[in-house]
């Protein structure tokens, strides 16, 4: 997407990544994490944050040398060339943005309608989903600087609300609630949950997907990635300590989808419940804003470089590309037609596979981009283990989703094979910006 010439600053890039990472997950699956990890939830967030930092090591080394809005696909293409695997991964990357938009739209409707005491029915949900996607799509008409400024404000409000939650919660904490449980079953639950919550750190990739629009990307892309992960890790751990330190685990599990809002009541009362609900709306909004921006950039870059159909790169209204409108429209369609829980799990597995190929690409290109081989090998082993844990979890909890993952990979491969045969298009060698 050819946006205006103004570049994103370091902190605007950080705010975009934080906006995606502290998205719906901290609010919607917090109760699930409490059920699996118990009072080891803060340690779970630390462990999953370490996984993210390992992946980020490869992202920063590659992102400093390979500047492209195609993000991880540019890294993989540089390492293994133009082939069916690269093409399939590029389609999976773009689809992950589409489905994420749908998830955020559904999550926003779920919080917004009760907050304004509106009837929760199919019509109101649909109108809300369409409206919120349309709003942030319109915001993206005005280019990366408008997106960055809006994201900075949204993330600031969200962090202030979560900061109040953390500060107030720490004052009234029950120390016995947060003592780590070292029983073997509890430790295994913590490791298992870390594979789930690793997904809560996935948003840092939006930085590399917008690297062409970031000031001094060689310096700021690595900085933005590490800063954003560390900020998010601090917030996650603080929220977890405040939540489990004020509410017994059993009550957190019962609260399920609004666990944080319920956890705020003991020390902030009804005002806390309201603030956390508003924080959830800001959180989901910022995640959607950054995801629409990142998804449109990926669609444009991949079309320009030969992997998606040419109409994705055509400019239409307001000098934006059709890729922006198609990405948003498909996101709305998924939100209106499908239950997104299973699809979200499939998307998470897709990101894991992309991360594995990014680390592999770093190993192949290590002489060119720099880095230590032992760290790269260790990262690959760890992320592969996390991926297998995720698959195992889905196998024992939702067999349909497990088969859906396999079907997704096979389906995309078949599409890629047919697409290349019919169109004869290949990746362009001009997808990279020399840094």
Curated annotation (Swiss-Prot):
Signal peptide: none annotated. It comes from Methanocaldococcus jannaschii (strain ATCC 43067 / DSM 2661 / JAL-1 / JCM 10045 / NBRC 100440) (Methanococcus jannaschii). This is Uncharacterized protein MJ0609. One of its GO terms (cellular component) is plasma membrane. Keywords: Cell membrane, Membrane, Transmembrane, Transmembrane helix. One of its GO terms (molecular function) is transmembrane transporter activity. The chain crosses the membrane at residues 14-34, 44-64, 84-104, 123-143, 153-173, 187-207, 224-244, 267-287, 324-344, 346-366, 375-395, 400-420. It holds the Pfam family AA_permease_2. Gene3D superfamilies: Amino acid/polyamine transporter I (1.20.1740.10). PANTHER family: AMINO ACID TRANSPORTER-RELATED, INNER MEMBRANE TRANSPORT PROTEIN YBAT. Its main location: membrane. It is a multi-pass membrane protein. It is found in: Cell membrane.
């Amino acid at each position: 997407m050819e946006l205006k010439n103004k570049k994103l600053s370091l902190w605007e890039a950080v705010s975009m990544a934080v906006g995606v990472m502290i998205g719906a997950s901290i609010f919607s699956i917090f109760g699930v994490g409490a059920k699996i990890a118990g009072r080891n939830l803060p340690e779970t967030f630390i462990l999953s944050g370490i996984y993210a930092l390992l992946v980020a090591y490869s992202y920063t080394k590659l992102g400093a040398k390979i500047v492209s809005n195609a993000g991880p696909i540019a890294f993989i293409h540089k390492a293994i060339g133009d082939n069916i695997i690269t093409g399939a991964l590029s389609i999976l990357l773009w689809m992950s943005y589409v489905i994420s938009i749908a998830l955020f739209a559904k999550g926003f409707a779920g919080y917004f309608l009760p907050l304004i005491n509106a009837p929760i029915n199919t019509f109101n949900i649909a109108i809300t989903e369409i409206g919120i996607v349309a709003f942030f799509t319109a915001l993206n008409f005005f280019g990366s600087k408008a997106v960055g400024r809006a994201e900075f404000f949204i993330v600031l409000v969200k962090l202030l609300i979560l900061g109040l939650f953390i500060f107030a919660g720490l004052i009234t904490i029950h120390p016995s609630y947060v003592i780590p449980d070292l029983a073997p079953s509890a430790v295994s639950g913590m490791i298992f949950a870390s594979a789930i919550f690793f997904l809560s750190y996935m948003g840092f990739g939006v930085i590399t997907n917008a690297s062409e629009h970031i000031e001094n990307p060689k310096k700021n892309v690595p900085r933005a990635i590490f800063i954003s992960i560390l900020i998010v890790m601090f917030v996650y751990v603080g929220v977890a300590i405040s939540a489990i330190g004020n509410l017994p685990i059993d009550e957190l599990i019962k609260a399920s989808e609004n666990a944080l809002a319920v956890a705020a009541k003991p020390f902030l009362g009804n005002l806390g419940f309201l603030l956390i609900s508003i924080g959830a709306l800001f959180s989901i909004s910022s995640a959607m804003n950054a995801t629409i921006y990142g998804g449109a950039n990926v669609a444009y870059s991949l079309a320009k470089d030969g992997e998606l159909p040419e109409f994705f790169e055509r400019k239409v209204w307001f000098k934006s590309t059709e890729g922006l409108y198609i990405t948003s429209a498909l996101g709305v369609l998924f939100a209106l037609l499908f239950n997104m829980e299973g699809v979200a799990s499939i998307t998470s597995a897709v990101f894991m596979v992309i991360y594995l190929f990014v680390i592999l690409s770093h190993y192949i290109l290590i002489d060119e981009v720099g880095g230590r081989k032992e760290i790269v090998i260790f990262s690959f082993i760890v992320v592969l283990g996390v991926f297998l844990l995720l698959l195992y979890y889905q196998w024992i909890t939702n067999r349909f989703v497990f088969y859906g993952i396999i079907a997704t990979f096979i389906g995309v491969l078949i599409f890629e094979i047919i697409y290349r045969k019919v169109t004869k298009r290949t990746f362009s060698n001009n997808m990279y910006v020399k840094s």
